[in-house]
From Swiss-Prot:
This is Hemoglobin subunit alpha-A. Involved in oxygen transport from the lung to the various peripheral tissues. Heterotetramer of two alpha chains and two beta chains. Residues 2-142 form the Globin domain. GO terms for biological process: hydrogen peroxide catabolic process. InterPro entries: Globin, Globin-like_sf, Globin/Proto, Hemoglobin_a-typ, Hemoglobin_oxygen_transport, Hemoglobin_pi. The lineage of its organism: Eukaryota, Metazoa, Chordata, Craniata, Vertebrata. One of its GO terms (cellular component) is hemoglobin complex. Red blood cells. It comes from Columba livia (Rock dove). It comes from the Eukaryota. Keywords: Heme, Iron, Metal-binding, Oxygen transport, Transport. The gene is HBAA.
Length: 142
């Protein structure tokens, strides 16, 4: 997925505004993922999956930090997430569709907390961005 200059600007602007809340948003997105797509819980049998769990919040923060890292290096997402891509492809072996599902959940959480930010144009840019991140994370599966 090719991000235009306008897409990149939109993504950077959103991440600048969500700033310090990214970790909380990541936790909420992960919890939403588990509720909406219960099959995704299979990768976390050792987690306390109850509402507000410290483990969900902690992993959600890692997810958000990866998205922030990708946004900060939007011209080289593959380079920024290379180690994470290796981890998911070689060790964790997460089904690639789950990245798309989690990306969608993250967009929903951003929309809930920052509705004025999510204009149709910005929504399209963020959608392209999370798809690009998912593509990078699954690139080493082959």
């Amino acid at each position: 997925m090719v991000l235009s200059a306008n897409d990149k600007s939109n993504v950077k602007a959103v991440f600048a505004k969500i700033g310090g809340q990214a970790g909380d948003l990541g936790g909420e997105a992960l919890e939403r993922l588990f509720i909406t797509y219960p099959q995704t819980k299979t990768y976390f049998p050792h987690f306390d999956l109850s509402h507000g769990s410290a483990q969900i919040k902690g992993h959600g923060k890692k997810v958000a930090e990866a998205l922030v890292e990708a946004a900060n290096h939007i011209d080289d997402i593959a380079g920024a997430l290379s180690k994470l891509s290796d981890l998911h492809a070689q060790k964790l072996r997460v089904d690639p569709v789950n990245f798309k599902l989690l990306g969608h959940c993250f967009l929903v959480v951003v929309a809930v907390h920052f509705p004025s930010l999510l204009t149709p144009e910005v929504h399209a840019s963020l959608d392209k961005f999370v798809l690009a991140v998912g593509t990078v994370l699954t690139a080493k599966y082959r």
